[in-house]
């Protein structure tokens, strides 16, 4: 299957989106971030948004990409949105939300449409979307996004916009993102219980890639790994093409739990140890340095402290980080070993701040590795922290309205039927990569 270049994929219509207000909500296991911004479409190194509001709350009731306590999660979401609204002096009624579940599937399709020496019209493109929806429909899953990747007519590729062209057969390559119906419906319900309508759902590893990858990295081949608290998500790019994305249900919180269990200490103390001494290069602490920590179940000043070698903490952290990154590598290899070939690895997210994680990732993937912060999106606020990569990418990615799925139905999503559905999408990727 031939996939088209990101350089031919589209973007927002400046005339349409200029000065529009957008809101995004990044729901994670550790934090919830709400951004409200105005799209200025002014291209410079400071970004093309005026960031109006930022809400940042500790997450509660959400773990490993799933809702585990709706009532407490609703309160966290409501507070993050309220904080962003207060800062912006605006009240929002719709929002873009992320999904970071290992139940999301990324499926490639090639659809052939006979055109019989007539002109390609919007009708043929709509037919292709309908075919993919029918092929990918199951009663327990929903399509939440379809990404067109490229076109060819009679075997000739490099067609940016096929509308108006003649030929015998039109081939369209698409990537369908699907997820278990209950997960999507639960996300919608919990957000809308805060009196905000879910306008769109975005897969987190794609958003993180938009926020962190350079054009050269997307072109030459890269694997983006977003190391969150409850999950680690990844997306693969080469030749400026989005190839694949997925999630493994392990993250930084698993390191904390491992430390707590192994050392018989509280989760709170384990988190402190992870932050202070949780590097993954064990030889950094081979000089026998120790740290004192209170044993689980004892109060302070009761003689319950015990000494723990820093190298022990690093060993525990390394074991879990290695397992998580290896799961990512194996998942990509199982799709296609070629996806790993000559790919640079880019790490982001809170877990990417672990000391030595870049060296460990280089060992596992046998590739160059860099740690990334999100590219500047606004000159008003500094969100250049890897924990904001997903939220920043969501803000940029959400500006493409040409393939927004407007309404979830029993067969997936009813697609926005714009006149330049595919060509607009291709321009967006060209503008943002």
Residue positions per predicted region:
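Short beta-alpha connecting loops at secondary-structure transitions
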Residues: 243-244, 257, 309-312, 343, ...
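Glycine-rich phosphate-binding loops at beta-strand->alpha-helix junctions
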Residues: 30, 179, 279-282, 340-364
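Nucleotide/phosphate-binding catalytic cleft detector across ATP-hydrolyzing
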Residues: 1-31, 35-223, 241-243, 266-268, ...
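Extended, folded domain segments that form the structural surfaces/walls around functional sites
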Residues: 192, 226, 323, 330, ...
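Conserved phosphate-binding/catalytic loops in two-lobed NTP-binding clefts
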Residues: 122, 126, 364-392
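A short acidic Gly-Thr/Ser loop motif
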Residues: 25-31, 100, 224-231, 237-240, ...
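A conserved active-site cap/scaffold subdomain adjacent to cofactor or substrate pockets
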Residues: 249-273
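Hydrophobic alpha-helical bundle architecture
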Residues: 331-339, 343-350, 364, 370-379
